[in-house]
């Protein structure tokens, strides 16, 4: 916003001192620059967001700059983690192409961790993977130090991380490691602009091959994920209704189309329900009709469950993206801090063209601000 340019108070913005295991792109060239901060926000540093800018070959910078152009000026200004020179280049190149405004990097506060080499839009590799890995790690450090109260992450490319030597399935697993927890859960949430109803879908398994899903669906895992989903939904309703999707067609057809429902899911759900009578638990339901009520609730035509447990990645993401592609937010649960991200990828095919839509990033930032205060 234009009001951010009228800044009077200077604040030092430096990377945190971290153990030697913290990755660095080029420590000798880290020319950190401080940005001014509005007087009204000077005492609100712990209430602001930290935003890692994602893979520099993707659309992360574009959607962040577009989202910040619409960020309410009365909210604390987020702290960005990335490369200033690269961000300024993106702004210069994208501004004439973009149909919507972009925030001027000159008015934004940023921890500057420079890129060691030029990155071309759409061409991810070891250099871009090393950068996005470092930026994420530094953004987490800012949250853990209390300088920010929530983390928003722009998309990264897993193959770029792997090329840089960072063998993680995704950002969620890296966040769990940095936080010192065994795992974090992926929840996708969106609020219908038509009805106000909130879609909440949690994944029982995440980035694993489909062939590995049945073996991963232990009773303990399913019950653990239900605990996480119920706890989140109880923020909004004390006695929530949860729905669990089946794994097989027709939810196994009483064991005729697969035994996972009979042998694992149904006993696990019954035992969990006995321990949690305050929650209405339904399932396992046939996956092809499990989210029908969600579609009606999104349109304002009916009520639906407060939360859905999907058993594998695409089972949960297909209904989420059909209903709320531009509004959905990925929220990591089970961490000691709040993390959200947009529900889309790096967008390499459209990087550098100025046409990326920022609604999901805007929703991720708004959700982080809302949930961190809940």
Segments predicted by a language model, with ranges:
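Low-acidity, Ser/Thr- and Arg-rich intrinsically disordered low-complexity segments
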Residues: 3-12, 17, 22-24, 29-34
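Anion-binding alpha/beta catalytic cores of soluble intermediary-metabolism enzymes, centered on
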Residues: 36-304, 308-374
């Amino acid at each position: 916003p234009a009001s951010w340019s009228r800044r009077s108070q200077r604040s030092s913005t430096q990377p945190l001192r971290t153990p030697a295991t913290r990755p660095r792109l080029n420590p000798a060239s880290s020319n950190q620059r401080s940005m001014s901060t509005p007087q009204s926000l000077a005492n609100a540093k712990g209430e602001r967001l930290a935003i890692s800018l994602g893979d520099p070959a993707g659309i992360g910078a574009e959607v962040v700059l577009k989202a910040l152009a619409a960020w309410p000026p009365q909210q604390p200004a987020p702290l960005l983690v990335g490369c200033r020179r690269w961000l300024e280049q993106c702004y210069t190149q994208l501004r004439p192409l973009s149909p919507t405004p972009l925030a001027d990097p000159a008015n934004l506060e940023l921890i500057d961790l420079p890129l060691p080499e030029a990155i071309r839009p759409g061409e991810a590799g070891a250099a871009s993977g090393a950068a996005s890995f470092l930026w994420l790690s530094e953004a987490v450090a800012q949250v853990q130090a209390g300088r920010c109260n929530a983390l928003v992450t722009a998309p990264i490319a897993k193959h770029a991380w792997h090329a840089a030597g960072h063998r993680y399935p995704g950002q969620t697993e890296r966040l769990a490691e940095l936080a010192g927890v065994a795992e974090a859960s992926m929840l996708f949430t969106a609020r219908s602009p038509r009805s106000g109803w909130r879609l909440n879908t949690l994944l029982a398994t995440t980035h694993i091959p489909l062939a590995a899903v049945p073996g991963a669906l232990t009773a303990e895992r399913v019950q653990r994920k239900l605990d996480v989903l119920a706890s989140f939904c109880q923020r909004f309703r004390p006695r929530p209704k949860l729905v669990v999707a089946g794994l097989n067609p027709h939810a196994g057809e009483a064991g005729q189309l697969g035994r996972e429902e009979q042998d694992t899911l149904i006993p696990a759900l019954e035992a969990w329900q006995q321990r949690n009578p305050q929650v209405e638990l339904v399932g396992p339901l046939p996956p092809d009709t499990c989210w029908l009520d969600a579609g009606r609730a999104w349109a304002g035509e009916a009520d639906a469950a407060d939360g859905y447990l999907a058993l594998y990645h695409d089972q949960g993401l297909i209904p989420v993206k059909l209903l709320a592609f531009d509004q959905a937010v990925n929220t990591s649960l089970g961490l000691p801090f709040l993390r959200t991200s947009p529900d889309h990828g790096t967008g390499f095919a459209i990087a550098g063209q100025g046409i990326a839509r920022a609604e999901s990033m805007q929703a991720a930032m708004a959700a982080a601000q809302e949930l961190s205060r809940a």
